[in-house]
Amino acid sequence: MKKTFNFLLAAGLFCISTVVWADNSQPTAGTELRPSQKAMQARAGWMKEMNTNLPTMKYEEVAKSATALASQTEAAGKTHPNPLGKDLTLKVSSLATATAEAAGKKDGGTAKMKLTEIKATCDECHAKIRDKK
């Protein structure tokens, strides 16, 4: 009887802890990403795609990612409330446009140089705005 009770108690605790753990792993309103975080993740994804596709000479894919980055940053930059953030975001947009043009011409050297400039601009923005907080 005592062994049965202990087994049922252990099984019950296991089931309850599993349910509680599973419930905690679901995203809540407090853990959802803010719109700016979603935008930054998209930008990071496009940068990763370009850095992956450029060495393999997939220029069409590089141009596609650069165009997406350019249009998203242009739209965000026009309404950015911080003047420095606005300037840096629009700079990323113009560099991404130049990257797309270079990729369209299959000019890997220029595209790589522009990607390096985009990364430097991102780092500058993070240092002066995001990480400053």
Pin down the residues of each PLM region.
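Bacterial N-terminal signal peptides that target proteins for export
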Residues: 1-9
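Basic side chains
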Residues: 2-3, 43, 130
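Short, linear, compositionally biased motifs with a strong N-terminal bias
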Residues: 10-14
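N-terminal signal peptide c-region/cleavage motif recognized by signal peptidases
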Residues: 15-18, 22
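Extracytoplasmic c-type cytochrome modules immediately beyond a signal peptide or single-pass transmembrane anchor
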Residues: 22-119
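The canonical Cys-X-X-Cys-His
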Residues: 118-130
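Short Cys/His-rich "knuckle" micro-motifs
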Residues: 133
